Amino acid sequence: MDRHRYLSILTPELVAGVVPAAYELFMTERRGSIAIIPPVDRSDESRVESIIRAHGRPIIAFAGRMGSGKDHACDYFCERFGAIKLHIFESGLRRIGLFYGRAIDKSIDRSVLQAVGELGRRLRPQFWLQMTFEEDLLRILDRDRPVVITGVRYKTDVRYLATLGVRTFIIRRPGLVLAGTPEESDPSERDLDDYHECAELINRGTVGDFDALLAETARDISLSELVPVTDTGRECPRIFP
């Protein structure tokens, strides 16, 4: 994200309320000074990673641009296999929602989501991902159900997830029509465009075509722990209502 746009979107009050660990960094940059990245406590990181690696049920992730079909793919696995859906930015979404006192609306809040996401990444690349894992993923791993992760947008996240045994699928949607908004050109939307080091799903047809591709994907990756559920019309379960 362009630094001038980044600073014009966020306010000191929002940063203090949503990502206080980055407050001094943000204020220093706002004054035009050279920022020194503060150290972040990572004492729980190895414990969290060990728990995730030892989890006996599948954890898979879907990556791609906005509108590519990430959430639909997660919902498919929730409905067919009883998986639990988790957004990789769940921790940030919750904090921003609490700050605003309302539910997040991506149609109007996307620029703030991108700015807050980038600010956390200034502290370390996996800042929000690891916050989400510590606060949210660990609480659902003991439910003995598969987990599907949505919202993956960076190469560093894909590679980090791979070290934990999480397989990521990048969804490409060649026919996606863009509106030309600044949010569409944000680095979070473009970072995976040239990345081809993991499996890719091409979403180029109808919803039915995409569902067929997802069904084939479930078979091909041999997720033997995935057991189809009978109620395919139920709402995709998430951590928070």
From Swiss-Prot:
Q: What is the lineage of its organism?
A: Viruses, Duplodnaviria, Heunggongvirae, Peploviricota, Herviviricetes
Q: Which gene encodes it?
A: ORF76
Superkingdom of the source species:
Viruses
- Species for this entry: Ictalurid herpesvirus 1 (strain Auburn) (IcHV-1)
Record InterPro entries: P-loop_NTPase
Q: Which protein are we looking at? A: Uncharacterized protein ORF76
